[in-house]
């Protein structure tokens, strides 16, 4: 049950004694409505949201784009670049967990409430840009993979086929989307695990008639500090999606349970996926392998290169098939998140009202089709080559991600200060960020540094086109912020005026005889032993 956004309702604060009597962990969300007040439907289960947090960080970039990052940064540069960016991501996820366990809004709405509506508009539009460019990048990957099998078919032919498919598929509703992402994420996880096993055998000399080189010893850094900086941008793009749990909150059946669970699991998934894959690539593929820097329109995955170098020439077909599945999953997620971001902007009056239109299935169809149209940007690889086009798009998406992440952490600082100043207890928060404010402070500082230095390589020698590509979104953020502020006459929100009431989920105490077992799902069904293990990791 939620307070309508347009209504002012009195805040109900639990006293310290009440908190001691019932326990903070025993507060549950009263939210049984199938549709929320926005018109979209609650069709995502806890397992969907949890898996989407995983699926969001296993995109085609893991299989394809990291080949470019390896070529630029070398094996050590790749690991260092992703390690630094992961610190920012962890701080962002803790902030989102605290927001969305209490309010099922997206972060541009949070920013509008607790900083400035104009600041919220700037964050929201930058996040839309993240996903517009991501969709184009994923289509570039998809068409490149398909050209591995059909080199004589033009890339735009493959693009048009799948563009038509996703145009129809996205209209089936959020429950279909959630179930498909759950299955695809599981397939990706299995495949990555299999490759880790292969990499260990390969590096240990377990492949007959093959002596692997010590790549970490022979060539740890490909291009010095510049290579590490370039790896930052790739990391920013490949990590894009972990914050998508903020988008799924409004369509989750139990956000209070689903969001904190997804946030807690993020650290281990980042460690397993990105550090695992960085090490695996570093010990199986040389940074100067000619296939990584090929100017052809077909991008080859380091996985494909590694397995073919091991002597399994036809294994590349299997690897490409799995990468194809990953591309389909990422495009599916990109359209979903991008369209919901645009829908939320329209709902908050920060985008044209037409994007608020929702069909009977709860799908914001105008936003879906508008966002999906930007997939046509991928067609430019027909003239520039997939590698070059992918690089252009990656830069735009990476810078947008850094800006949005840094802004989210800043909003969290404001939220915490206002929450305490208005007399609320931290124990009233369904999910409280551990070690606050240290993860956020570290992430905030690193986020600012990454935003400023990610285009460092364009200065030596100076390249005007690359400079614009690397930094154009930074001034654009301030242009949107100041333009909206001037047109709408918005004001900086003081701590005393922050709204912690409207839209806040109503919580009620659950006493011991009413508590549901941890061995039950949100539907009241018993969970298996393996599902409970999965929740812990």
Curated annotation (Swiss-Prot):
GO terms for molecular function: amino acid transmembrane transporter activity; L-leucine transmembrane transporter activity. Gene3D superfamilies: Amino acid/polyamine transporter I (1.20.1740.10). InterPro entries: AA-permease/SLC12A_dom, APC_YAT. The keyword Transmembrane applies. It is a multi-pass membrane protein. GO terms for cellular component: Golgi apparatus; membrane; plasma membrane. The keyword Transmembrane helix applies. The chain crosses the membrane at residues 52-72, 76-96, 157-177, 183-203, 219-239, 267-287, 318-338, 362-382, 393-413, 462-482. This is Uncharacterized amino-acid permease C965.11c.
